Amino acid sequence: MRILGIETSCDETAASVVLRDEEGRGRILGDVVLSQLEEHSAYGGVVPEIAARAHVEALDALIEEALLRAGVTLRDIDAVAATSGPGLIGGLIVGLMTGKAIARATGKPLYAVNHLEGHALTARLTDGLSFPYLMLLVSGGHTQLILVKGVGEYERWGTTIDDALGEAFDKTAKLLGLPYPGGPAVERAAQAGNAERFDFPRPLVGDARLDFSFSGLKTAVRQAAQSLGPVTDQDIADVCASFQRAISRTLRDRVGRGLKRFRADFASVDQPALVVAGGVAANQTLRRTLQSLCDEHGFRFIAPPLQLCTDNAAMIAWAGAERLAAGLPADGLDAAPRSRWPLDSEAKALIGSGRRGAKA
């Protein structure tokens, strides 16, 4: 089956065509991603209205290009998958409405996909991974440890109780005057730094639960930067390196406890696996930390290619293909975008719920 995927949840506009064969193997036939980095860099972060307008301007052409690269037309597509949440509501509306229009015009089924499910299932596209497995989702908006039991079957074992890890990177970069996006800037600066100069806190280390916390670390970084007076390039490098060291040590404890729990709960799984997903998964220091941790616990470590860690439509198309193959019902044209949409939406919220519902 061939699935057209559409992704517009934040500041990347993307379209992709993915093939899923009868044996369940996946192949990306055509994939296009347009970053809005230039549009938002002057503001030091994503501006929702600018993002939505950019999606409107770019999406149609990107869909045409993805189809062209795949060598197919809309008649050859078996279904349409569009991100329906979580994310910025303006962008979600653009992508989902476009998906609905294509589905209506072609008579093909529509799958309104949870963006987080796209991340959760990417390892099955790239590595043919079998269920169950453990996923660490680390992005600008989410830090979660998730048990992936099957298509549509997810259980959050841990989540951030305050800032997501990607937020911590971005805010650290902003405090130090580094450019947007903050994650890559912090990683580059850290390469020349002394990771032992600052002893930053490791939030929740030793706690029996599997949740994460990064607001205290962010505060410690701010206090360290303010104590230095005029900050030199070496100071910035040392702060970034020490920050990454604290993150690595925190993840070793939090994720390590998750690996032990997986071993206990799924003793019959011969080759357990940890998958890392999300934009922060591109950080090489964190990848090395997780690889070492998996080696110690006898887990297979799977990190998708960098282009599939950040937002992309291939993972959305693949999630649609997985749902279609699993016999899950398609969505109607009344499917609504959701700014908040936890993967385990039927479960009790692990953290607070505001007026907009449970946090993802």
Swiss-Prot record:
<keyword id="KW-0963">Cytoplasm</keyword>
<dbReference type="GO" id="GO:0061711">
    <property type="term" value="F:N(6)-L-threonylcarbamoyladenine synthase activity"/>
</dbReference>
<dbReference type="InterPro" id="IPR017861">
    <property type="entry name" value="KAE1/TsaD"/>
</dbReference>
<dbReference type="InterPro" id="IPR000905">
    <property type="entry name" value="Gcp-like_dom"/>
</dbReference>
<feature type="binding site">
    <location>
        <begin position="137"/>
        <end position="141"/>
    </location>
    <ligand>
        <name>substrate</name>
    </ligand>
</feature>
<dbReference type="Pfam" id="PF00814">
    <property type="entry name" value="TsaD"/>
</dbReference>
<dbReference type="GO" id="GO:0002949">
    <property type="term" value="P:tRNA threonylcarbamoyladenosine modification"/>
</dbReference>
<feature type="binding site">
    <location>
        <position position="170"/>
    </location>
    <ligand>
        <name>substrate</name>
    </ligand>
</feature>
<keyword id="KW-0819">tRNA processing</keyword>
<dbReference type="GO" id="GO:0005737">
    <property type="term" value="C:cytoplasm"/>
</dbReference>
<feature type="binding site">
    <location>
        <position position="311"/>
    </location>
    <ligand>
        <name>Fe cation</name>
    </ligand>
</feature>
<protein>
    <recommendedName>
        <fullName>tRNA N6-adenosine threonylcarbamoyltransferase</fullName>
        <ecNumber>2.3.1.234</ecNumber>
    </recommendedName>
</protein>
<feature type="binding site">
    <location>
        <position position="183"/>
    </location>
    <ligand>
        <name>substrate</name>
    </ligand>
</feature>
<comment type="function">
    <text>Required for the formation of a threonylcarbamoyl group on adenosine at position 37 (t(6)A37) in tRNAs that read codons beginning with adenine. Is involved in the transfer of the threonylcarbamoyl moiety of threonylcarbamoyl-AMP (TC-AMP) to the N6 group of A37, together with TsaE and TsaB. TsaD likely plays a direct catalytic role in this reaction.</text>
</comment>
<dbReference type="InterPro" id="IPR043129">
    <property type="entry name" value="ATPase_NBD"/>
</dbReference>
<keyword id="KW-0808">Transferase</keyword>
<dbReference type="InterPro" id="IPR022450">
    <property type="entry name" value="TsaD"/>
</dbReference>
<keyword id="KW-0012">Acyltransferase</keyword>
<keyword id="KW-0479">Metal-binding</keyword>
<feature type="binding site">
    <location>
        <position position="119"/>
    </location>
    <ligand>
        <name>Fe cation</name>
    </ligand>
</feature>
<keyword id="KW-0408">Iron</keyword>
<feature type="binding site">
    <location>
        <position position="283"/>
    </location>
    <ligand>
        <name>substrate</name>
    </ligand>
</feature>
<comment type="similarity">
    <text>Belongs to the KAE1 / TsaD family.</text>
</comment>
<feature type="binding site">
    <location>
        <position position="115"/>
    </location>
    <ligand>
        <name>Fe cation</name>
    </ligand>
</feature>
<dbReference type="GO" id="GO:0005506">
    <property type="term" value="F:iron ion binding"/>
</dbReference>
